[in-house]
Each structure stands twice: as C-alpha cells, then as structure tokens.
C-alpha cells in the first residue's frame, strides 16, 4: 500500500496538472457575481458552454456582458472622469480572478479607460478559459 504522503502528492500534482483549483476558483467567482436562483444549473450551464466552445473552436463565451463591465467600471470611477487608477484596475482583475497574486502588472503611466478595461478583461477571460 502506498504511503499517505505519496498519495497526497499524487493528488496535488493531478489537481495542478489539470488546473482544477483555478477552474473551481473561476466558477466560484462567476457564481458569486451572478448569484443565480439555481446555482447548480448555472454551473452546469457554464461548464457546458465552455465544453462546446472548446470542442467547436468557437469563441469562448463572455460571462460578464458589456453592461456588467460598464457597471463595474462606473463603480470604480466615482468621479465620472472616464478613467480609473492603475491600483483600481489591478484590484478589479484580482477580484475577478483574472490576475494571480504573484503576477506583476507594471503601471506604464497610462490612464485606464473603459475601453482599455473591457478589452483587457475580455482578453484575459478568453486566455483563462482556453486553458481548461
């Protein structure tokens, strides 16, 4: 019989290889964002949409539509200037699970507009979902 430590290591490697924890974190983030009345059906729907997108090589579905993105941006842009700070931008990406804690994002001094925010979110979402 295998030692417990060996089985634990095998389990850990399996989860890492298949990126299961990242997938669960993303699904949880979207579940908490949407707060559907039927969470199980919602999660099944998300996974099915991802499976179809991957199998048919079509674009991955965006789980936050434009109105959600605009609302999030407007909450951060409380002064209505049409831009947010780099710190706000980075925190939003972290909160959505689109930026890892150890990822280094460099502030290039440019302002973050709604278009920049939306484009970067969509790019990161597509990249993230394509890994699963």
Swiss-Prot record:
Domain EF-hand residue range list: 64-99, 120-132
Gene giving rise to this polypeptide: Efcab10
PROSITE patterns associated with the record: EF_HAND_2 (PS50222)
UniProt-listed InterPro entries: DD_EFCAB10, EF-hand-dom_pair, EF_EFCAB10_C, EF_hand_dom, EFC10
Natural source organism: Mus musculus (Mouse)
Signal peptide annotation: none
Keyword tags: Repeat
Origin organism lineage: Eukaryota, Metazoa, Chordata, Craniata, Vertebrata
PANTHER family: EF-HAND CALCIUM-BINDING DOMAIN-CONTAINING PROTEIN 10
UniProt protein name: EF-hand calcium-binding domain-containing protein 10
MF term (GO), any: calcium ion binding
